[in-house]
């Protein structure tokens, strides 16, 4: 497995991501905030576009823990990465920012 780390932002708004290649597939863990914990996970899979079967599109399944709001981030990231890579992608979101102001 190959892994690569990324970061964006600063202080309480610092987000970090680790991407791990799992054969042809990809797993991404995105975390940040005061107390990281699992909030949502999305699994994106490639499929032919409904408009043009020669174009790769994607579908996603999402699990979001009660009270968490990371499902939109996990889903969007999974769908975009599947379109770019053409392989299955999982995105795990571990973000917790209390009362964000920006």
Residue ranges and their predicted role:
Residues 95-101:
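Residue-level detector of conserved catalytic or cofactor/ligand-binding positions
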Residues 1-36, 40:
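N-terminal, charge-rich interaction modules
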Residues 1-7, 69, 73, 91:
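A contiguous, well-structured "functional interface" segment within a domain
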Residues 32, 43, 95:
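A short beta-strand motif that forms part of the nucleic acid-binding face
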Residues 41-86:
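Short, internal acidic amphipathic alpha-helical interface segments
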Residues 88-95:
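Glycine- and acidic-rich phosphate- and metal-coordinating loops
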């Amino acid at each position: 497995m190959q892994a690569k780390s990324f970061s964006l932002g600063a202080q309480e708004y610092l987000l970090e991501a680790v991407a791990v290649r799992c054969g042809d597939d990809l797993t991404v863990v995105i975390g940040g905030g005061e107390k990281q914990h699992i909030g949502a996970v999305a699994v994106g899979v490639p499929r032919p576009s409904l408009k043009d079967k020669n174009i790769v599109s994607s579908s996603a399944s999402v699990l979001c823990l009660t009270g968490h709001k990371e499902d939109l981030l996990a889903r969007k990231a999974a769908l975009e990465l599947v379109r770019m890579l053409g392989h299955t992608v999982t995105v795990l979101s571990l973000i917790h920012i209390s009362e964000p102001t920006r």
